[in-house]
Amino acid sequence: MFDRFFPDRYVSSTYVIDFEKLYEEGYRGLIFDIDNTLVPHGAPADARAIALFDRLKKIGFKCCLISNNQEPRVKMFNEPIQVDYVYNAHKPSTKNYRKAMEIMGTDETNSVFIGDQLFTDVWGAKRTGISNILVKPIHPKEEIQIVLKRYLEKIVLYFYARSKKQVKK
């Protein structure tokens, strides 16, 4: 019932992902959400985000930001990291996930999406057919519509955790 929303992987933070291992597994394109995935909502790129994208470029990844925000927000975040981006993405629509892969020159088999929301980020990636990693939100302060979605996400994540326990038995 809820499995269409289950992430492929679920980790505590973008910053704990083993990107070298992803590269070894054959992934070449990384698509990122911004707010509460890389920085707190509305924040500019911080030193940690800048260092991450420097590292990802050195590994050999193509990177693209995909955000439901308007261009000024995305452009402000992207200025110090200088990767491709898609704004006003209408996630979970698949159109701009595909556009991000087209920009990077990757496809469903070698792209990974990283985001903090099940009903926009993960569901859009799953509908597009790409691997996805759900991360816990960086900061608890969020817009009201996101707060409401978080309650529903807790229900889905409960069933996700139960499904993982059943697999281990």
Predicted regions and their residues:
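Asp-based, Mg2+/Mn2+-dependent phosphohydrolase catalytic module
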Residues: 2-32, 42-43, 47-62, 66-169
